[in-house]
Amino acid sequence: MNLYNNSNSSGSSNSSSSSNNKTNIDYNDINNNDILTPKGYHTSIYIDDNDLNNNQIINKNNNNNHNRNNNNNNNNNNNHNNPKKMVINLNPSGIFIPLMNDFDDDDDDEQESLIKNNKITIPTINSQIAIPILNNNDNNNNSNNKTEQTTTTTTIIKNTTIFNNKTISFGRIGFRSIVIFLILVPYIYILNFAIFPWTVNYETERKGKIHSFISMALVIQMLCNYYLCSTTDPGSFKDTISPSYYLLHPISSTDSNDHKKWCNKCNHQKPERAHHCRYCNRCVLRMDHHCQWLQNCIGLFNQKYFVLFLFYTSISIIYFFTLLIKRSIELVTKYTMEKTLPSFDLLHLFLLGILIIILIIAGISIMALLWTQIALISKGLTTIEHEDKKRKYQQPNYLNLYKKYDKGSIISNFSIVFGNLSFLWLLPTIPNNLKITSKKGDIFIV
């Protein structure tokens, strides 16, 4: 195993030559211990057996040591042949970067270009470094030869902790305030304009009370599901594997044959069906999409609340639309009989027309989204998987991946999101069957 040694001595004429010296590392030096890494721009850190056994890394980077190394190449090579000492280079986030070219310590753009071009090795996990495996067919190659990363993928993943149903902070309240405003204001107006007149009339008092109860129940369901959907953690996880595990089980950052992937942004392996959200800056389990109106991702643990919110909002729009039409008919009938209307009723009639138009536009949009969610859930797919499936429909092997998510029937597929107890499907309760199953160490989100 080879690592590149980069001395961090600025102003040294031999810095480029010393940065390409190779150090042979024995796996026994790792001892399956976690290696804690400080942060710094290309910090050269010397590690010996005692440091590894104590799970510590002592930063012994000083100019005297680097000057001695730069002035005497023979001594430098002798030190590198010592299997009890190694040098690793870290960027600010603790990621080891092979030095393909010499660049300044403050050149973040060039560092990012290396990462984007997959020039980095296995990244760190929770501020711990996973020493990478680099191809080395010839130990005598000169400093201009580039090193490529192995593309072998990991075979197991274990010791993974799932954080279920954690409440996250309400965060930005802008979009959420708008949604609550759009729910409550029409309801209050309809309650006073369309329902209240029925309650003051003896003949229609019972009808008014029934409509009051139904409208209140619908609004409570909308607000409750909206709150749960926006504040429930959609599903996150913490990789607790020892960093030294990835020495023997490197993993690719792109899709492989077994579809195990490494997230270069989160610096850990992504479980199956997990995707990284650029807005939440984390990987979300069984991610469907990120909703700006909720300021949250729709994923494993809150998709039911999202679908219920769309469902009750659609029902409420239809119900309120019916009440407004009935109230409009009453006003028009009153006008035809009395040949006149008070100015107050004329104002209400004008607002009625505007509100009806808003309900029609909102209803079409929300019902279309609800239909899309129902169609995808019935197939056992998420929105992201559906879009990937359309883009890669010519790849049979890729399409076969999603067939295992289909449980064979619509009821079975719905039970994955809503739970096995069908009589609780329309209530904002936690699905009783959300769990993580493990088969031969691989994580499957069901």
UniProtKB/Swiss-Prot annotation:
UniProt GO molecular function: protein-cysteine S-palmitoyltransferase activity
Reaction(s) catalysed (UniProt annotation): L-cysteinyl-[protein] + hexadecanoyl-CoA = S-hexadecanoyl-L-cysteinyl-[protein] + CoA
Coiled coil regions in record: none
Chief place where the protein resides: membrane
Listed GO CC annotations: endoplasmic reticulum; Golgi apparatus; membrane
Disulfide bonds: none
Protein name: Putative ZDHHC-type palmitoyltransferase 2
Protein family per UniProt: Belongs to the DHHC palmitoyltransferase family.
Membrane topology: Multi-pass membrane protein
Positions of transmembrane segments: 178-198, 210-230, 305-325, 349-369, 410-430
Location(s) in or outside the cell: Membrane
Residue span of region Disordered: 1-33, 56-83
Keyword Glycoprotein belongs to the record: yes
Top-rank taxon: Eukaryota
Biased composition (Low complexity): 56-81
GO BP annotations listed: protein targeting to membrane
Keywords of the record: Acyltransferase, Glycoprotein, Lipoprotein, Membrane, Palmitate, Transferase, Transmembrane, Transmembrane helix
Domain remarks in the Swiss-Prot or TrEMBL record: The DHHC domain is required for palmitoyltransferase activity.
Domain DHHC, residue spans: 261-311
Enzyme Commission number(s) of this protein: 2.3.1.225
Residues with glycosylation annotation: 5, 8, 14, 21, 141, 145, 159, 165
Pfam families: DHHC
